[in-house]
A protein has these predicted regions:
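Glycine-enriched alpha-helix->loop->beta-strand junction motifs that scaffold or abut catalytic
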Residues: 63-68, 238-244, 266-270, 287-291
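Active-site cofactor/substrate anionic-group-binding motifs, chiefly glycine-
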Residues: 38-75
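Conserved, mostly hydrophobic/aromatic
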Residues: 14, 47, 62, 219, ...
Length: 291
């Protein structure tokens, strides 16, 4: 029986790493690694796809530091897609799908939408998504009538830009015109994006954040081997998820491989990660299937 009982145990406080001579300075060290073929992490940390660990708050915090969070799948398709959108909208170089209101909205609608999404400004558009104005916290600060039309308080005629190269000079444009939000429109005056001074500050404060090509925080989401997997992946893809994790206890099975092939053939440009596995044979089988 004695050979089955560990007689000595060590914990972190019991072990010290003895420093040795080094010519490597901290600024010379890179902790970056690849999460997928297309996603580089600045720190090798991924949060678990567990309902007690990762929803949008954790995913935002992890991505801000350079890692990536995997949203758990124990929720409805609609809610999981919403969690993805919360991460993607939390900060960005340019918000590609800004939340908007139309002229039929009220001050109460604007207050509710700002509070729900934790935002400070909402572009006002018509039925063709043409920009009519913008309403911000400053416009609503002293408003008491929740039934007042949004057209009565919105700011119209604010500076907008259609020049993509203006993005590089967004901070100077905002400062020069003493505004905090810069709507971006196309040649037909349709809203295509929104740049905020707050996001520019966030970019400066967190230079190692894990972001996509549009400056948005990256996020992954878990799916299972279920009948509605394609429907879930479609919703997540439409929400701009960066990677799909096929999350299962044993990933080296026929069912998992078939789901992987089905997802990859339907969404060929989406990065797919599969787990859990424990052997090189399993890894090769999943790579061959598209992971």
């Amino acid at each position: 029986m004695n050979n089955k009982i560990m007689k000595e145990g060590l914990t972190y406080d019991d072990v010290l790493v003895v420093p040795a001579y080094s010519e490597v300075l901290p600024y010379m060290v890179s902790t970056s690694t690849k999460f997928t073929k297309n996603i580089i992490l600045n720190i090798p940390i991924v949060s678990a796809a567990m309902d007690t660990v990762t929803e949008s708050i954790m995913a935002i915090a992890i991505a801000q530091e350079g890692g990536i969070g995997v949203l758990h799948k124990n929720m409805s398709i609609e809610r999981q897609a919403l969690e993805v959108r919360k991460v993607k909208r939390s900060e960005s170089g340019m918000i590609l799908d800004p939340i908007t209101l139309t002229l039929s909205a009220t001050v109460g609608d604007a207050f509710a939408l700002m509070r729900e999404n934790k935002i400070g400004g909402i572009p006002i558009v018509d039925e063709d998504v043409k920009l009519l104005g913008i309403v911000t916290n400053r416009d609503l600060r002293f408003e008491k009538d929740m039934n007042l039309s949004i057209s009565e308080v919105m700011t119209s005629g604010q500076l907008i830009t259609t020049e993509l190269n203006d993005l590089e000079n967004a901070e100077s444009i905002l400062k020069e015109n003493k505004i905090e939000k810069l709507p971006i429109v196309n040649s037909d005056n349709q809203l295509v994006g929104l740049i905020t001074f707050k996001d520019i500050i966030k970019n400066r404060m967190r230079p190692n954040a894990c972001k996509d090509q549009y400056g948005r925080l990256r996020v992954a989401a878990a799916v299972g081997v279920t009948d509605d997997v394609l429907k879930r992946v479609e919703a997540l893809s439409n929400a701009s998820v960066d990677a799909i994790i096929i999350d299962t206890a044993h990933g080296h099975t026929k069912g998992v491989v078939e789901v992987l092939k089905k997802v990859k053939s339907t969404f060929p440009n989406l990065d797919i990660v599969v787990g859990n596995i424990a052997t090189s044979a399993a890894a090769q089988a999943l790579i061959d299937a598209g992971a």
